[in-house]
Curated annotation (Swiss-Prot):
GO terms for cellular component: cytoplasm. Its main location: cytoplasm. Transmembrane segments: none annotated. It is found in: Cytoplasm. It holds the Pfam family Gly_reductase. It is an enzyme of class 1 (oxidoreductase). This is D-proline reductase proprotein PrdA. Consists of 3 subunits of 23, 26 and 45 kDa (alpha, gamma and beta respectively). The molecular weight of the complex is approximately 870 kDa, suggesting a decameric structure, if all 3 subunits are present in equal stoichiometry. It comes from the Bacteria. Keywords: Cytoplasm, Oxidoreductase, Pyruvate. It comes from Acetoanaerobium sticklandii (strain ATCC 12662 / DSM 519 / JCM 1433 / CCUG 9281 / NCIMB 10654 / HF) (Clostridium sticklandii).
Length: 629
């Protein structure tokens, strides 16, 4: 793969290797040279061996090949004539301490003198051979030349800004934008009964509720509700499609503000297959014993000790990979959840066990940043419902696929109040489900960081077709441009096809001079197959021992430890501090070393979460992923 002129300048001191066959007499240009970024892989595969006398790119540009050479031939002195001489950059001297001294008056720098005569602009340059130019004003205006303004009075020194001086706006008082109150109600038991109600810390679910839930869509052929207590965690389950909080708004409150009532101790879990028993999932599924297929305690997973209100939805055969099929399963489940929400609305405030106050502040004068979350947008379960009426509800929400996958801005509190109902896809280990957004670690970390002014959270869909990917990505770039931010986080779930637009998002934001920190599951199996020069600051969400998608729910998703690393990296990038180039191959020690550095600088301990090795061995791990153990 050849390089561009811009890339050749950046890699002037890297070694020069032909990317393709070149004939004798060829004048070497960027189009003849291989990308140095892939040399390591080529060497590992035995396709490339670089000798000690290999020339650098800056030395070979413009030189003539004296004999024909094949692709992947390192360019050495005997192959070329007219080799350039390049000098190494002089080492930067350490900046000395500033010395106070009287400030001398600075005379204005000599500038070309412009005179306007009639419709002509005459320029006299008192250098060299006294060049005089006469240019029509209509053309001069296009060149950006304007008529001279009045000169400053003689003897008055005009202020001159230092080349390195930065104008920093004074930090103002934090501005409270909106608040959200969450009232928590404790649930200790879930049982079936004649009606849906909440009484004495117990949820009672109407015994015949499934008879009505199945009528929500003609694609739903059956639905069952199973109450899973901690004693039942070893039971078999079909693939987990979503994990959802049970919450409802008080009064006419909207998502992201007002008061939300939340149930503690129980969650909704959506599972299902089609009539032929095919799991409603793509590239991996988490069917099996629950205790062996869930990474408990992750932002998007159940917590140990919670009661799981698990629906098992059956949809018509062959509809599991069509948009209406998975959506029907979610709608049928939400019918049941809504009855519980209505019961939750009726509880007296005396039963509140905890009141959580969330506040969104803007911080004038602090580093303004934006969080960009790439979500799936190919259809089927590759979809998300944005801003329902109820937290993680269905009614009132708009699918991002129907919105064209274009960027949609949410406030941090809208995200944390159930503003995203995820129809999750990709492998279970790296999918971000509805509960993940309800407890989104990066949003929480950045929103509460007093050194940042969080402008908002942008959700952008990942379409299937490349042309649509780049269209959406360009809209994202334009949106971020209007925000005038100083830094950006870009996250994605899963891996593979979505990395194409993930890379494009980095380019669209980075080309506007904005430092970007990217977050994705990569490691071994999800390694990036595309990239660009703006993808310098990356955080890998991998937790798995082998660096793979092992189909354990939420194993490789963004967690608090990743958010802390990303925040530290963006602060370093904004400050233009050195960030070492990533290693070519996955090395888990990189993460551990970075965590140690952050702990040392911040003076606080970062808790690293366990991975699948603490779980009972699942069937898939035993037969596929860890068969050699």
């Amino acid at each position: 793969m050849s390089i561009t002129l811009e890339s050749a300048k950046e890699h002037a001191n890297d070694l020069a290797v032909l990317c393709c066959r070149a004939e004798e007499g060829t004048v070497i240009g960027p189009s003849n040279l291989e990308d140095p970024a892939i040399f390591g892989d080529l060497e590992d595969s035995g396709l490339l061996t670089i000798p000690a006398n290999c020339l650098k790119i800056g030395e070979v540009l413009g030189a003539k090949l004296v004999k024909t050479a094949d692709s992947l031939t390192p360019l050495t002195p005997e192959l070329l004539e007219g080799v350039n001489s390049i000098s190494e950059e002089a080492p930067k001297q350490e900046a000395s301490a500033p010395v106070e001294a009287p400030v001398a008056e600075v005379a204005p720098a000599a500038m070309p003198v412009a005179n306007v005569t009639g419709s002509m602009l005459k320029i006299h340059i008192g250098e060299g051979k006294d060049i005089n130019l006469e240019i029509p004003l209509t053309i001069a205006g296009q060149m950006g030349v304007v008529a001279p303004t009045a000169a400053a009075p003689a003897g008055v020194a005009m202020p001159v800004a230092s080349a390195t001086e930065q104008v920093v706006a004074p930090a103002g008082e934090p501005k409270l934008v909106r608040t959200l109150q969450k009232k928590h109600f404790k649930i200790e038991k879930v049982e079936f009964g004649p009606e849906t109600k909440i009484e004495n810390n117990t949820i009672y679910i109407r015994e015949n509720i499934c008879e009505d839930a199945v009528k929500v869509s003609n694609l739903v052929t059956d639905i069952k509700v199973e109450i899973i207590t901690p004693a039942d965690y070893g039971k078999y389950s079909e693939t987990i499609m979503d994990v959802q909080p049970i919450a409802t708004k008080e009064g006419d409150g909207k998502i992201g503000q007002g008061v939300t009532r939340v149930i503690d101790g129980a969650i909704i879990m959506v599972t299902g297959t089609d009539e032929d028993g095919v799991q409603i999932g793509e590239f991996g599924s988490s069917e099996g014993e629950l205790d062996a297929n869930i990474m408990w305690g992750r932002p998007g997973a159940p917590d140990k000790g919670e009661i799981l209100i698990k629906t098992q939805v059956t949809i018509k055969a062959g509809t599991n990979m069509e948009r209406p099929g998975p959506l029907a399963a979610h709608k049928a489940t939400d019918f049941i959840t809504q009855e519980i929400r209505e019961a939750l609305k009726k509880l007296d405030d005396s039963e509140v066990v905890e009141t959580e106050e969330l506040a969104q502040y803007r911080r004038p004068g602090k580093k303004k940043v934006v969080i960009i979350k790439e979500i799936m947008g190919q259809g089927a379960m590759h979809d998300n419902l944005i801003l329902p009426v109820e937290p993680v509800g269905v009614i009132g929400a708009k699918p991002n696929v129907d919105l064209g996958n274009v960027p949609v801005v949410l406030s941090p509190l809208e995200v944390l109040d159930g503003g995203i109902h995820a129809l999750t896809c990709i492998g279970p280990a790296s999918k971000e489900n509805s509960r993940h957004y309800w407890r989104e670690p990066l949003v929480i970390e950045v929103m509460n960081d007093e050194e940042f002014d969080l402008a908002g959270v942008v959700f952008v869909g990942s379409p299937q077709v490349n042309a649509e990917k780049f269209y959406v990505s360009e809209r994202l770039g334009m949106l971020v441009e209007t925000m005038d931010v100083e830094g950006a986080f870009i996250t994605t779930e899963g891996f593979g096809n979505n990395h194409i637009d993930f890379a494009s998002h980095h380019e669209q934001v980075g080309m506007r001079g904005i430092p970007v920190v990217g977050m994705s599951f990569c490691a071994v199996q999800g390694a990036l197959v595309v990239g660009n020069k703006y993808m310098k600051y990356m955080v890998d969400n991998n937790k798995s021992e082998q660096g793979i998608e092992n189909e354990i729910l939420s194993n490789n998703t963004l967690c608090p430890e990743d958010a802390i690393r990303a925040v530290a990296m963006l602060k370093a990038a904004i400050a233009e501090e050195e960030v070492k180039v990533a290693e070519r191959k996955f090395n888990k020690n990189v993460k551990e070393n970075n965590v140690d550095l952050i702990e040392e600088q911040a003076g606080k301990e970062i808790t690293l979460l366990p991975n699948e090795q603490v779980l009972p061995m699942s069937k898939k791990r035993k037969e596929i992923y860890e068969a050699d153990k």
